[in-house]
Amino acid sequence: MTNQLKEKLLAYGTKAEPFTVHNHIRVTDLQDGEARVELTLQPESLNRWGTAHGGILFALADIAAGTAVLTLRQEVCLTVNASIDFLDAAGLGSTLIAVGHVDRMGKSLCFCHTDITDETGRLLATLRT
């Protein structure tokens, strides 16, 4: 990945997509086949029990996986199937860190996994797509 592509993906994932801006999601690091995406939990990202809503965890993991693919192939990337396991909870103010990895890239399908941890390294969720 060139430095120019890295800068473009960092800017796009942080400022240009309305969903990421609205949900305070930011792309913080990129390597070939890997993307790190972060979110500090705000009140609107919580469920009725005061912990991260499953939807925000899924979105964060999916964005990390999709961005990881974009580091290798600069084409539209859509999720066709995904499975997530929710392992632990995090509350208001916690920083969630999703690291997406490309496991295999074919001509038309890519297979990825993403782990979400909090700022202490506690594993909160895993996604396979």
Model-derived regions: residue spans:
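Terminal targeting signals and extreme-terminal segments of soluble enzymes
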Residues: M1-T129
